[in-house]
Amino acid sequence: MDATAFHPSLWGDFFVKYKPPTAPKRGHMTQRAELLKEEVRKTLKAAANQIKNALDLIITLQRLGLDHHYENEISELLRFVYSSSDYDDKDLYVVSLRFYLLRKHGHCVSSDVFTSFKDEEGNFVVDDTKCLLSLYNAAYLRTHGEKVLDEAITFTRRQLEALLLDSLEPALADEVHLTLQTPLFRRLRILEAVNYIPIYGKEAGRNEAILELAKLNFNLAQLIYCEELKEITLWWKQLNVETNLSFIRDRIVECHFWMTGACCEPQYSLSRVIATKMTALITVLDDMMDTYSTTEEAMLLAEAIYRWEESAAELLPGYMKDFYLYLLKTIDSCGDELGPNRSFRTFYLKEMLKVFVRGSSQEIKWRNENYVPKTISEHLEHSGPTVGAFQVACSSFVGMGDNITKESFEWLLTYPELVKSLMNIARLLNDTASTKREQNAGHHVSTVQCYMLKHGTTMDEACDKIKELTEDSWKDMMELYLTPTEHPKLIAQTIVDFARTADYMYKETDGFTFSHTIKDMIAKLFVDPISLF
């Protein structure tokens, strides 16, 4: 058994008793928000006559976390924008924003529109900060072979970094910092709202109704998140982790933060709760099988999960037995929450867990045999499913509406290419963030070590290569996102959202394992309301 020690929970029982100070004002905030929604709806309809105004308004609503209130209006507007040529194709800001929004909404527009902004020597001609930001953000919706977008990223990054040395006005400087840290398309939508609301509040051309609605919308959502956290924390406490499972990562609040990053809308409350429980259970399985148990114990646990029956608990050592029975009980209770028409979906929760332990068993075998996969592709084939991204993304669909059909779940279990791109992004990001810690702890060979051993490189060189492969996987995802399927667009959108969460959690370090690195952001999302004044 590995003696790896993870730091204890940073939150404990905090959310069992906590209510944001806005809770007593909930009724008034809801009424005020409903009035403002209609006022903003009128503004959105009025913008339909001018493409630049429409694009500016749509991107503002998206960044403030308000777009889900106006899905039909925005879709209709963007269909008009897509079919219309009535815009200034010499304005790089407009061209970039049009490209960004249309691709983000699944319209396959050509990147050739950017070639006219290059001089005879092939260099971009841009001297405006807003244009640079717009081009940089648009370029990250690239697919394979779009050289002009690859060049745009290199050019604009260099220009934006230079601008930070100048004295930009505060709101613009904040924008440049945020953009260089993470391009707009890859940011978590709910965290973007938290970060952008104060920036938007500094803008001279802000719309006061939109700003007030954004603040109310966030504060109302925060109340829902805290109610979920109370329920989930009480569920988690029944495992008595501190006593019975002291060797695992106690990260229930971080699990919910992760799920909220991907499914932030209020109507997805059940989705967040189920996906959070699944993420926590997978974390326990991962730490048991990968870090703490003997090989024999890990294989017994895998066998029990394949059997999925209470009597299989008799196979297990004491520290696994109670967890296994609680796992079965939790999945059954998810069926009760889903109701008779959707309880069939718990079958897919079980199947996802079986996929996870099957992959974990393979990794244990590799570790015991000192086996190094011959290629990164071979590694990803087995290690992609064990990073957990597939399981948590699919479990989020379990709590969603009836538009996610049985056929959709069956399709997801075939590992469609879109799902593979998510697993690859998550695995590659995880490995670059945690490779030193895991290698020191005697884990199986990661994709980073696999590349080092096969190519004789240093760890830094291997990490650079893995980052290139991560970018390739993002391009794969974008191509697949733009490819129509018979399944609801919500599935593709949510899978992209989970890729964003992986990017956030593993950007600099393993933020899930070393959760003090994301504690301030968790507090911003769950603890601190946004002041209305």
Curated annotation (Swiss-Prot):
Catalytic activity: (2E,6E)-farnesyl diphosphate = (E)-beta-farnesene + diphosphate
Enzyme Commission code(s) on record: 4.2.3.47
GO cellular component: cytoplasm
BP GO terms, sorted: defense response; diterpenoid biosynthetic process
Keyword DNA-binding among UniProt keywords: no
Keyword Transmembrane: no
Pathway stated in the Swiss-Prot or TrEMBL entry: Secondary metabolite biosynthesis; terpenoid biosynthesis
A GO term, aspect molecular function: terpene synthase activity
Keyword line: Cytoplasm, Lyase, Magnesium, Manganese, Metal-binding, Plant defense
Binding site for Mg(2+) 3: 430, 434, 438
Cofactors, names only: Mg(2+); Co(2+); Mn(2+)
DDXXD motif (motif): residue ranges: 286-290
InterPro entries named in the record: Isoprenoid_synthase_dom_sf, Terpene_cyclase-like_1_C, Terpene_cyclase_plant_C1, Terpene_synth_N, Terpene_synth_N_sf, Terpene_synthase-like, Terpene_synthase_metal-bd, Terpenoid_cyclase/PrenylTrfase
Ligand binding (Mg(2+) 1): 286, 290
Residues where Mg(2+) 2 binds: 286, 290
Location(s), subcellular: Cytoplasm
Signal sequence segment: none
UniProt similarity note: Belongs to the terpene synthase family.
Domain notes: The Asp-Asp-Xaa-Xaa-Asp/Glu (DDXXD/E) motif is important for the catalytic activity, presumably through binding to Mg(2+).
PANTHER family attached to this UniProt entry: (E)-BETA-FARNESENE SYNTHASE (PTHR31225:SF118), OS04G0344100 PROTEIN-RELATED (PTHR31225)
Function: Sesquiterpene cyclase catalyzing the production of sixfold more beta-farnesene than alpha-bergamotene from farnesyl diphosphate. Involved in indirect defense by producing volatile signals attracting natural enemies of herbivores.
Full protein name: (E)-beta-farnesene synthase
Organism from which the protein derives: Zea diploperennis
